């Protein structure tokens, strides 16, 4: 028999159990990424299919976009999407190595000089977003010491990424600056 790369699934839980209902919901309504994550966490699936599904959201600048975080749509990379990607990688034990080095280069490129991440990058507006996502106009020089076009750093955007990278023992120059910003 040819090897397909798919891991054999354990038998499904009894038909009336909450896990069975959750599994049915995932297979009927979720994106491929969430299906692979469910299989990884509950059906003894591998991490490679999760990583492959996540790769579809990676952008040319090594960030993540394409609506990875459901609260923000559009193809462009955003710190919000990239933080979501790091959480996925962390959940499957793959938050390290060259993959995360490339993500840190992206984070360096989009952060303020002190390492802070913006919630939403300027110039990336015009795509649908949840009503609570802070999409604001490009900062003016008067309200931003960095000048027009530079985003304000946000603690709420920076802290989760910094904490996750520290938990995974990632070392990067951007991370040192971002850590100082958080403290």
Feature map (PLM): residue ranges:
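Preference for long, amphipathic alpha-helical scaffolds in soluble/luminal domains
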Residues: 1-183
